[in-house]
C-alpha cells in the first residue's frame, strides 16, 4: 500500500527537564517513534524499543478515536457515574468490588519492570497526544496513569466482569436483598433475545493449500468500531498486525512474521458462585468454612457520581470479601461470592508476549500463563502447524458438585484446586484431516472424526453446543483442495445459510397444513418455498427468513408446532 501521510514525532531541540521526568521521557519516545498511515488510514507504527512502539500505538489510537479510548477507561476503572450519573454507580461498584484504585496502584508497583515500562509507555502515549492536541477535551480523564491497564487486560467484546449482574449488585448493596425472581428471569430472557453475535476461526494446513503454507481465517464479530486495525513494530522483535481494542497496548488478534492467532468467545465454565454462610457476632462478621469461622474482609468504597444538576456527589458502600471473591449479590437468603480470573499483571504479560512468539513451542508456553479466561484460540504458524486451544484459564473442580449453580462455600471440597495446564485442557494440534475450525461451537467437532473426545475431559471444560456456523464451516472445509487466498476469502463469504435450510421447510409445511390463504401471506410463503437458502443484498427471502427466525428464537416452536393443540395463535394472523 502506498503511504499517503507520514507522521514523525519530533524530539524538542532543547529540554531543560531531567531525563526521568514524564515530559522528557515522552519526548524521547516521540523521537524514536514513526507512524506511517497507508491509503486505508491504517497506522504502521515503528519504534526503536517495545515501549516506543507502545507509545506510538496509543498515540495513533488517540488520533483515530480518543473518545473510545477514554470511554473504555472511564468504564473499566469505575468512574462511569461521574459522566452518566447515578444510574451507572453500580457498574462502578462492580469494578471496585474486584479491585480498588489503591489495589490497582499496588499491583502496578509490584509488577515486573518490563510490564511497568509498557504500562508507563501506554500512559505516556495518551498523555503526549493530549499535550500536543489541546483542542481535544476529555469527558473526564485528562491525565492517564500507568496503573489503569490493570483494570483493562481483557481485549474481548464481553469480558468476564460483565457477566456479573449490576442489578443483583444493586439489590444487595442498596437493599440487602436478592433480586426478585421475576426480575432475574427477565434479565435471563433479555440476554437470550440479544442480537446474535459470534466469531469464526479456521486454520488450514499446507496439505490443502496451493502454496503449501498454513492459512488462518480471522473473522471476529464485533460492533463496527469496537477495535482499530494496526501494524506495530520495534527493533526488539515486535512486528504484529491485527486488531487492537481501543486503549490497549497489544494486538488482540492478528499475526506476526511467524505466527497467527484469533479468538472466539468460549462457553467454558470459568466463573463460579459460592453461597456463603455468614455469622455476625460481637467480634465482627465471619463466614463458615469447614470447621472454622473465617473473618469476612470488610472495607469501604467511596464512589463519585453526577447528580441531576450536574454536581458531583459521593456515595459510600461497604465492600465484603471472602477467599472465594467479593460478595456480589444474594441468593436464597445467602450472600454470594463471585470467583473469576483476576490476575491483571499476568494477563497483560500474556497478551503482549503473545504477539512476539515465533513458533508453536513458544506460543504454547505463552498459553500456559493461563489468564485468557473468556476465549478460545485458533492458531497457525510459518512452520505449518495448526492448533486449537479450547479455553485457557480453567479451574480444577470436584465434578461431584454442579458448578453451573451456586455451590456451598462452607464446604472446602467446592474450592478450586488450582488450574488445569494447557496440556490438560482441550487441545488439538495438526489433526490428520488438515483443517480445524471453531465458530463459538463445540470443540468436539472442530476437526470432524479427528476432534477431541468429550469423554476425555471434565464436563465443565466445554458447555459449548454445536451451531449452524460450525455446521457450515465443516461442510465447506470438507470440500477444500489446493485452496489459495482468494479461495479462502470466497469460502469465508459463502452465502448458504444451513440454519434456514433446517428451519424454513417446517414453516412452509405448517402453512400448507394450517395456514389461512391470503394474498400477501401466500406470496411470502411462495418466496420462501422457492428459496435456495442463500443470502444476497437483494434477497427478499433472506429478509423474510430473518424476521421469522427472530420470532422463532423468542417463541420457539410455539409459532407453528403447538397451534394444532389450540395453545397459541398463528403469529401471521
Language-model-derived ranges and their functions:
Residues 2-8:
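Sec-dependent signal peptide recognition
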Residues 47, 52-100, 262-312, 413-469:
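Gly/Pro-rich active-site capping loops and adjacent beta-alpha segments
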Residues 13-14:
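C-terminal motif of bacterial Sec signal peptides marking the signal peptidase cleavage site
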Residues 237, 243-248, 254-259, 263-407:
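Glycine- and hydrophobic-rich flexible loops that cap the catalytic core of alpha/beta enzyme folds
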Residues 20-227, 235-238, 242-250:
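Substrate-recognition/specificity elements adjacent to catalytic centers across diverse enzyme folds
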Residues 242, 249, 372-480, 535, ...:
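Hydrophobic alpha-helical segments
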Residues 343-345, 358-364, 369-371, 378, ...:
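Ordered core of a single globular domain
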Amino acid at each position: 500500500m502506498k503511504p499517503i501521510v507520514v507522521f514523525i514525532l519530533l524530539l524538542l531541540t532543547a529540554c531543560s527537564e531531567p531525563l526521568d521526568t514524564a515530559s522528557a521521557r515522552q519526548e524521547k519516545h516521540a523521537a524514536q517513534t514513526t507512524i506511517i498511515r497507508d491509503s486505508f488510514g491504517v497506522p504502521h507504527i515503528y519504534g526503536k524499543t517495545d515501549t516506543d512502539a507502545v507509545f506510538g500505538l496509543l498515540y495513533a489510537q488517540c488520533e483515530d478515536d480518543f473518545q473510545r479510548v477514554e470511554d473504555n477507561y472511564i468504564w473499566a476503572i469505575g468512574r462511569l457515574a461521574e459522566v452518566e450519573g447515578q444510574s451507572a454507580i453500580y457498574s462502578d461498584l462492580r469494578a471496585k468490588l474486584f479491585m480498588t484504585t489503591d489495589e490497582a496502584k499496588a499491583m502496578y508497583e509490584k509488577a515486573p519492570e518490563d510490564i511497568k515500562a509498557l504500562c508507563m509507555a501506554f500512559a505516556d502515549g495518551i498523555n503526549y497526544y493530549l499535550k500536543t492536541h489541546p483542542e481535544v477535551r476529555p469527558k473526564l480523564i485528562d491525565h492517564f496513569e500507568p496503573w489503569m491497564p490493570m483494570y483493562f487486560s481483557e481485549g474481548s467484546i464481553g469480558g468476564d466482569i460483565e457477566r456479573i449482574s449490576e442489578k443483583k449488585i444493586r439489590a444487595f448493596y442498596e437493599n440487602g436483598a436478592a433480586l426478585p425472581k421475576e426480575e432475574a428471569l427477565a434479565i435471563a430472557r433479555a440476554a437470550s433475545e440479544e442480537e446474535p453475535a459470534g466469531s469464526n476461526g479456521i486454520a488450514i494446513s499446507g496439505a490443502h493449500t496451493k502454496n503449501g503454507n498454513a492459512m488462518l481465517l480471522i473473522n471476529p464479530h464485533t460492533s463496527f468500531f469496537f477495535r482499530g486495525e494496526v501494524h506495530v513494530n520495534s527493533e526488539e522483535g515486535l512486528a504484529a498486525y491485527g486488531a487492537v481494542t481501543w486503549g490497549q497496548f497489544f494486538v488482540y488478534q492478528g499475526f506476526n512474521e511467524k505466527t497467527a492467532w484469533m479468538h472466539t468467545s468460549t462457553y467454558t465454565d470459568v466463573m463460579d458462585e459460592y453461597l456463603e454462610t455468614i455469622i455476625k457476632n460481637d467480634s465482627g462478621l465471619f463466614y463458615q468454612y469447614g470447621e472454622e469461622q473465617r473473618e469476612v474482609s470488610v472495607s469501604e468504597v467511596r464512589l463519585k457520581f453526577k447528580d441531576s444538576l450536574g454536581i458531583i456527589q459521593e456515595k459510600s458502600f461497604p465492600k465484603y470479601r471472602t477467599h472465594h471473591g467479593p460478595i456480589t449479590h444474594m441468593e436464597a437468603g445467602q450472600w454470594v461470592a463471585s470467583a473469576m480470573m483476576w490476575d491483571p499483571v499476568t494477563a497483560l504479560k500474556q497478551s503482549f508476549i503473545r504477539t512476539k512468539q515465533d513458533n508453536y513451542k513458544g506460543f504454547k508456553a505463552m498459553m500456559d500463563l493461563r489468564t485468557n479466561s473468556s476465549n478460545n484460540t485458533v492458531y497457525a504458524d510459518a512452520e505449518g502447524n495448526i492448533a486449537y486451544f479450547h479455553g485457557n484459564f480453567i479451574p480444577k473442580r470436584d465434578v461431584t458438585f454442579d458448578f453451573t449453580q451456586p455451590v456451598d462455600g462452607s464446604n472446602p471440597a467446592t474450592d478450586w484446586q488450582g488450574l488445569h495446564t494447557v496440556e490438560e485442557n482441550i487441545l488439538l494440534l495438526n489433526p490428520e484431516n488438515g483443517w480445524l475450525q471453531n465458530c463459538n461451537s463445540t470443540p468436539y467437532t472442530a476437526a470432524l472424526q479427528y476432534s477431541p473426545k468429550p469423554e476425555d475431559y471434565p464436563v465443565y471444560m466445554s458447555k459449548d453446543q454445536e451451531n449452524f456456523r460450525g455446521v457450515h464451516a465443516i461442510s465447506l472445509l470438507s470440500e477444500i483442495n489446493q485452496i489459495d487466498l482468494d479461495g479462502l476469502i470466497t469460502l469465508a463469504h459463502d452465502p448458504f445459510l444451513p440454519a434456514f435450510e433446517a428451519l424454513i421447510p417446517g414453516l412452509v409445511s405448517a402453512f400448507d397444513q394450517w395456514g389461512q390463504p391470503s394474498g400477501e401471506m401466500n406470496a411470502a410463503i411462495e418466496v420462501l418455498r422457492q428459496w435456495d437458502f442463500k443470502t444476497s443484498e437483494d434477497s427478499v427471502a433472506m429478509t423474510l427468513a430473518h424476521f421469522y427466525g427472530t420470532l422463532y428464537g423468542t417463541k420457539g416452536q410455539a409459532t407453528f408446532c403447538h397451534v394444532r393443540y389450540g395453545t397459541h395463535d398463528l403469529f401471521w394472523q
